A protein has these predicted regions:
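Hydrophobic alpha-helical transmembrane segments of ABC transporter permease domains
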Residues: 2-3, 74-78, 84, 115, ...
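Juxtamembrane helix-loop junctions of ABC transporter transmembrane domains
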Residues: 26-43, 66-67, 74-87, 108-155, ...
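A short amphipathic helical element positioned immediately N-terminal to and/or at the very start
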Residues: 43-56, 158
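Transmembrane helix-loop-helix hairpins at lipid-water interfaces of multipass membrane proteins
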Residues: 1-40, 61-115, 195-200, 311-315
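Short intracellular "coupling" helices and adjacent cytoplasmic loop segments at the cytosolic face
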Residues: 55, 93, 128, 136-160, ...
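ABC-type nucleotide-binding domain
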Residues: 363, 370-371, 377-627
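Helix-loop-helix
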Residues: 92-94, 100, 193-207, 277-356, ...
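An intracellular "coupling" helix at the cytosolic face of ABC transporter transmembrane type-1 domains
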Residues: 55-59, 147-148, 164-173, 177, ...
């Protein structure tokens, strides 16, 4: 009976620990979590789509699997070699055989290390290429979405999909899938080798497997919970930082730094607590698996030692010193991949969830697509016609109602009206940023729906009130990566739109740095750069949407002079805030609630004493009072 006491002690320890973990798992109640993303794809569908990106690199994956066989072989063969060497040393010692055994072991080790190195290099290269392909497809798809669709998706969400989520997918190709495959084969290979060597000791090792399964199930529950907490806290703090760093000037103006710091500290501490919980979960799981490993080693030494001393085990198996050494190494190599499998499963689920988020964006069908018979426009004269056009952003809420007008080539036409009258909407429809529900819009007598979108927009130049400048230089913001444009052409255009007056004063001229969104330039300077960017691409139709709003008087005079020059370039459409800037327009269209009230020249509309006359009179008196 005393011979069994050590085994009973080991079993009691494992049983108590397992019971405590099961009790803890039962007591911890899962809170019903509100997931910001509901999964709609099954794992098989996701893997099939990812396989499409991996297919071009199938040959390289085959090479990786071939190289992986060497490292698997090392894990299975090396314990047998060490066991044989132990028996050689403890038995009839022969130096040549010892050298031969060491040489074989060293050779297997070198091949394993080399294969592992090349396997890692190939996987990293292939994985990054796959993710690069995926990112490019995702970015291209985002570019194809309409303005309406882009308005519905937060920019931060798109950035996360292109960066963070694709990084999570990258881990699956560069590490997880191959490691999971290798671990499974290593476990199976070790089991076969142990059974062939000594089935009694193998059965002893397998007695610990149920406890590993229990620990793994419990670990998965707690690790998922901890992982979600970290993810939620990270998202929360990133959102807070994005908003408050953008509005930090407002915080400073109102002196609310301490209050904002208190909010940030609370969110930062929440993230720290979540990270500590995740570390604790992993910190508990690894020692538990290690405890099982130590217990199995103790049982090995006890049963193996008893069998070695007695010459035979309980089931009649013969155990040598080499067998014990071999099993000692096998047990170590058996528990390590099992521990890795449990941890990597969570990362795999995370990668699959990230994949679904990426595919959910790629599955959004663009609302603005070319017709099957769409044509290319080699040139545009600039004739524009609206025929009974109706449009609404939301069903039943018409923004434009039966709008009809005609614009001749090289005419300058202004759209006037109160906020929400439909001015900017008309300009957006001309460029096919949105799809109208009824009527026709013609360019040079051709329905714009029969023209390729890229071809149509290539002939338009849009200048908006909120000018967007990219980080880079003045030159890069004007040419927009179009090749073949010389500095002389750029400077000529800058002089044409009066942008040279401030560019010449800069230290680096066209190479002057442009910071994020062009915040190191004034609103007027950004607008002049926008004019230069538009003119250099030689548009046939120019669109100015509130381009002279919020600009000082001196800059407005420069812009007015630029506009006069630009009228000769092509057809010009203007949405004006200041009516004084459109007095020389060939035609002024007055809108109200999506309908055209009146149209004509400046003098003709004043003579009518209608809505335009009222707007002009009010604005004139306001300017007189301000003056």
């Amino acid at each position: 009976m005393t011979n069994v006491n050590p085994l009973l002690l080991v079993g009691a320890v494992i049983g108590v620990v397992t019971a405590l973990l099961v009790l803890a798992c039962a007591l911890v109640k899962d809170k019903k979590e509100t997931m910001s993303f509901e999964r709609t794809m099954n794992d098989g569908e996701i893997l099939r789509r990812l396989a499409g990106y991996a297919k071009p690199y199938l040959a390289k994956f085959v090479v990786v699997l071939f190289l992986m066989l060497f490292s698997i072989a090392y894990d299975i063969i090396s314990p047998l070699i060490v066991g044989a060497l132990e028996e050689l040393v403890s038995g009839e010692f022969e130096l040549p055989r010892l050298f031969a055994g060491v040489a074989v072991y060293a050779g297997v080790l070198v091949f394993s290390m080399a294969s592992t190195y090349f396997q890692a290099v190939i996987l990293q290269r292939v994985g990054q290429r796959i993710i690069s392909d995926l990112r490019e497809d995702l970015f291209t798809h985002i570019e194809s979405l309409s303005h309406e669709q882009l308005n519905e998706i937060p920019v931060g969400k798109l950035v996360t999909r292109v960066t963070n989520d694709t990084n999570a997918i990258s881990m699956m190709f560069t590490n997880l899938l191959v490691t999971l495959t290798k671990n499974i084969f290593v476990i199976l290979g070790i089991l076969v080798a142990m059974l062939a060597l000594n089935y009694e000791l193998t059965l002893m090792v397998l007695c610990f497997v149920p406890f590993i399964v229990i620990f793994t199930v419990i670990f998965r529950k707690f690790s998922r919970r901890a992982y979600r907490k970290v993810k939620d806290a990270t998202t929360d703090i990133n959102t807070y930082l994005s908003e408050n760093l953008s509005g930090i000037k407002v915080t400073q103006i109102f002196g609310r730094e301490d209050e904002k710091m208190a909010e940030f500290r609370e969110k930062s501490q929440r993230l720290a607590r979540a990270n500590r919980e995740q570390i604790f979960v992993f910190g508990v799981f690894r020692p538990l698996v290690y405890m099982l490993y130590i217990c199995s080693i103790l049982c090995l030494f006890y049963l193996g030692g008893m069998g070695h001393l007695n010459g035979v085990t309980f089931l009649g198996q013969t155990i040598t010193g080499g067998t014990i050494v071999t099993f000692y190494m096998y047990i170590s190599k058996f528990f390590t991949p099992i521990q890795n499998l449990a941890e990597q499963f969570n990362w795999l689920q995370s990668a699959l969830a990230s994949s679904e988020k990426v595919f959910s964006i790629m599955d959004i069908a663009p609302k603005m697509v070319d017709a099957p018979d769409a044509i290319e426009l080699d040139e545009v004269k600039g004739e524009i016609e609206f025929r009974d056009v109706w449009f609404s952003y939301l069903p039943g809420e018409w923004v434009l109602q039966g709008v009809s007008f005609h614009i001749d080539p090289h005419q300058t036409v202004a759209f006037v009206g109160s906020t929400g009258s439909g001015k900017s909407t008309i300009l957006s429809l001309i460029c096919r940023n949105y799809e109208f529900q009824k009527g026709e819009i013609l360019i040079d007598g051709i329905d714009i729906r029969k023209i390729k979108i890229s071809s149509l927009r290539r002939h338009f130049g849009q200048m908006l009130q909120d000018v967007f400048l990219f980080s880079g230089t003045i030159r890069s913001n004007i040419v927009l990566r179009e090749e073949g444009i010389s500095d002389e052409e750029i400077l000529q255009v800058c002089r044409y739109v009066n942008a040279d007056k401030f560019i010449d004063k800069l230290d680096h001229g066209l190479d002057e740095e442009v910071r994020e969104r062009g915040n190191n330039f004034s609103a007027g300077q950004r607008q002049l750069l926008s004019f230069a960017r538009t003119i250099i691409h030689k548009p046939s139709v120019m669109i100015l949407d509130e381009a002279t709003a919020n600009i000082d008087t001196e800059t407005e005079l420069l812009i007015q002079d630029s506009l006069e020059k630009m009228r000769s370039v092509g057809t010009m459409l203007i949405v004006a805030h200041r009516l004084s800037t459109i007095q020389h327009a060939d035609n002024i269209i007055v809108l109200s609630h999506g309908k055209i009230l009146e149209q004509g020249s400046h003098q003709e509309l004043l003579a009518k004493h209608g809505r335009y006359y009222q707007l002009y009179t009010l604005q004139y008196h306001k300017e007189q009072l301000e003056g």
